[in-house]
Amino acid sequence: MTTRDELKSRGEEIQHRIDAMGSDADTAPGYQRMVSEALYGGLWARDGLPLTDRYICVLTGLMLNKNEAQLRRHIRGALKVGLSAREILEVFVQAGLYGGFPTAENAMSIAHEVFAAEGAEFDVEEDGNETLEEFMSMGQDLLANLHGERGTKGYADPANKTTGPLYT
């Protein structure tokens, strides 16, 4: 059985790695130990997901819940564990489809501030110069690659009057 001290030690190891050490002076007495034990030692230290994948989940949740101070801190941590600036922005683009474009834009603005402070650089690609026909063809190719034969059956069947038009 894992002791509280072992959880705390595992948690603090992760906190140091991602620069997330807190202070009770900033929160409440005993709070930081609880965070080290439960959050970082108990959850972040679990097997099953690498820290980079955990950060994709964390950044998404913080963005969707508009936790800007924590988002700023965790963008910095995501860079420290190896996510690139571009990958972080892509997390916000993807999550923005579910949480709204203004929410994604706020997260991207915070990310750019953190990138500037941390010296994180990324290439800006020109996007959106395709004609509508080229864009539609790209989407159909992606659908075929993702779904294979299923891309034209069931709900994606062009003959399906309800959902077929979404896929053609």
Which residues make up each language-model segment?
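Short, charged low-complexity intrinsically disordered segments located at boundaries
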Residues: 88-93, 122-126
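Short alpha-helix boundary/capping elements
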Residues: 61-68, 99-100
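Acidic, glycine/proline-rich low-complexity segments that act as flexible tails and inter-domain linkers
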Residues: 1-52, 65, 80, 104-168
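Short, structured motif recognition centered on aromatic/hydrophobic residues
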Residues: 54-62, 71, 75, 88-92
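Substrate/cofactor-recognition hotspot
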Residues: 94, 99-105
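Helix N-cap / loop-to-helix initiation motif
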Residues: 50, 82-89
